[in-house]
């Protein structure tokens, strides 16, 4: 079944140059690949691409993952009067913003579990071991 047929929530993420930004993007991609949410393009929303703005303003549940307090993804959506239903600022979840470094995959795996539990409270702990890196 396609993501759109299930009407999954939309997930938007930061994807800037820092380690925390890349972790935000990684987490959004994982939510998409695992069928928890459908990832859409925040750059397109910020760039006023009509099709992508239409998707963002469609009334679907919105999840936003920002890597730092600058909250770029959140602000891009707010410029189109779209507010996140669920918002994550990774800096408030213990993620350090580092330039010219990769993010910690073990930390990302742990955060993915936390995000999924917030997004879908019915997420069962018995499925935790099946989460790929």
Where in the sequence are the language-model features?
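A general structural motif
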Residues: 42-46
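Iron-sulfur (Fe-S) cluster-binding modules
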Residues: 1-41, 51-61, 70-133
């Amino acid at each position: 079944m396609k993501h759109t047929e299930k009407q999954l929530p939309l997930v938007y993420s930061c994807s800037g140059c820092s380690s925390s930004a890349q972790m935000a993007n990684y987490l959004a991609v994982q939510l998409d690949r695992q069928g928890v949410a459908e990832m859409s393009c925040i750059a397109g929303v910020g760039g006023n691409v009509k099709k992508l703005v239409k998707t963002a303003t469609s009334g679907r549940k919105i999840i936003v993952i920002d890597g730092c307090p600058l909250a770029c993804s959140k602000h891009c959506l707010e410029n189109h009067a779209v507010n996140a239903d669920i918002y994550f600022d990774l800096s408030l979840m213990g993620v350090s913003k580092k330039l010219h470094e990769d993010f910690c995959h073990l930390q990302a795996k742990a955060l993915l579990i936390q995000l999924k539990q917030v997004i879908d409270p019915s997420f069962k702990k018995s499925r935790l071991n099946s989460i790929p890196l």
